[in-house]
């Protein structure tokens, strides 16, 4: 009986060690235009193809990952994100840091018109990447506090390649609002793209919740799922 028990323990440990090599967390994300480090992170929002003749400004999917000090975000379009086509594109990441729809700025309406989103959020911040003719426009890339319209940061990492764009911004770059981001706290995220390729029609995504600093469950070759955080020793 003792031998069987020990063999069982060894099998479990073997499975755990196999999974550990594949575990992914936000600390492993490098902003380099190679998106393989996002593959194990689940999709937060899937968005339908609904922008006629504007695949480059039409969101397909969003992913979010956070560590204890950094917010990372991946945006995927149906076409080429930020293309060299001579048109202007503005991609926005919305952050509802207190996860309360009745605080911050709602995405239920925009410039007096309903957005038709089914799960609106009340955003305190957005992060914008603005592109014109494939070049970064002066002053168009920034993190903004929506209620005061205060620009908090223009110096954060981002990279585009093909259909995807990734960015990372440390919580400290939110200045006096940095304390709003706490490990274990649930936030909501969404996105919208506004550009001239489709007569300035806006593509709004639905929202998703995200726990700051959360560990992702990883499944590898039908082995036991495990949280990366559980593998770490204090």
Positions of PLM-derived features:
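Extracellular/luminal beta-rich ligand-recognition
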Residues: 25-26, 30-53, 83-162
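A short beta-turn/strand-edge loop motif at beta-sheet boundaries
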Residues: 80-87, 175-181
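Short acidic, low-complexity intrinsically disordered linear motifs used
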Residues: 218-234
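Bacterial N-terminal signal peptides that target proteins for export
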Residues: 1-9
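Bacterial N-terminal signal peptides
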Residues: 8-18
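Ser/Thr/Pro-rich, low-complexity mucin-like regions
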Residues: 159-209
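Short, well-ordered beta-strand segments enriched in hydrophobic/aromatic residues
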Residues: 33, 69-79, 165-171
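Extended extracellular/luminal ectodomain segments enriched in beta-structured repeat modules
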Residues: 66-72, 86-88
